[in-house]
């Protein structure tokens, strides 16, 4: 993967294992951009029952894969962290400590000025149900129907992002609004069929209006 990027890139590309491995000058303005990155970060799923969260796990019984519930040691921590929600039995919560660690790393960057923006499939309030998507060749699959050459992804909790960076006054906008708010009028008012087709494509209207749930989250730090 790295070799392919280096061969095709016309500019110098550096790969880092940790964000702190990148040498940042305090006088630099850092731009952090990602597209469909955070939805690839694995989340654990928890189900609420009788005042506590149980972790949803995969088990095998008689050669068949099944979902089971197991005691979650962090149940109390989850209830506290998401205390603005009143959970009911069978509500599903998706939570990732890895995601929290990445956000903490970004928040603790030592540079005085940086701009952060990311675009991903997500939500601004907990859906209280599973958002796990399994795709193969751009087609949705059912859980356990296929195990090779598949992509697993979770919808991104942008409410968590917003709370994490609340002091930076973050902005959340869906892709459809982002396109229509920033595209020059000459294109928006165009009657050219090809132009209209491209606008429908990039705004998400072509794909079941996915542009409404494909969100952009941005903020800047300027000290």
Region locations from a protein language model:
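SAM cofactor-binding core of SAM-dependent methyltransferases
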Residues: 1-25
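A short acidic (Asp/Glu
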Residues: 1-3, 44, 126-131
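Hydrophobic/aromatic-lined pockets within catalytic cores
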Residues: 7, 42, 46, 166
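Short, flexible loop/turn elements at secondary-structure junctions
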Residues: 17-20, 36, 123, 221
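A short SAM/SAH-binding and catalytic strip from SAM-dependent methyltransferases
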Residues: 19-20, 27-50, 91-97, 101, ...
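A mobile, often basic/glycine-rich helix-loop segment
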Residues: 31-80, 132-142
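Long, Lys/Arg- and hydrophobic-enriched amphipathic alpha-helices
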Residues: 77-223
């Amino acid at each position: 993967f790295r070799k392919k990027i280096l061969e095709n890139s016309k500019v110098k590309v550096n790969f880092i294992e940790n964000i702190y491995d990148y040498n940042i000058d305090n006088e630099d303005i850092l731009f952090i951009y990602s597209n469909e990155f955070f939805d690839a970060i694995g989340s654990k799923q928890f189900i609420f029952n009788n005042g506590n969260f149980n972790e949803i796990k995969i088990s095998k019984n008689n050669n068949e894969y099944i979902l089971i519930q197991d005691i979650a040691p962090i149940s109390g921590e989850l209830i506290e962290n998401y205390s603005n929600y009143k959970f009911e039995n069978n509500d599903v919560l998706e939570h990732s400590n890895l995601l929290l660690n990445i956000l903490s790393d970004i928040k603790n960057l030592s540079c005085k000025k940086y701009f952060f923006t990311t675009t991903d499939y997500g939500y601004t309030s907990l859906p209280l149900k599973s958002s796990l998507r399994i795709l193969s060749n751009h087609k949705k699959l059912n859980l356990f129907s296929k195990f090779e050459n598949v992509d697993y992804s979770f919808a991104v909790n942008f409410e968590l992002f917003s709370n994490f960076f609340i002091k930076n006054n973050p902005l959340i906008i869906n892709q459809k609004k982002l396109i229509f708010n920033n595209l020059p009028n000459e294109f928006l008012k165009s009657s050219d069929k090809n132009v209209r087709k491209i606008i429908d494509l990039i705004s998400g209207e072509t794909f079941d209006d996915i542009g409404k749930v494909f969100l952009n989250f941005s903020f800047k730090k300027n000290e």
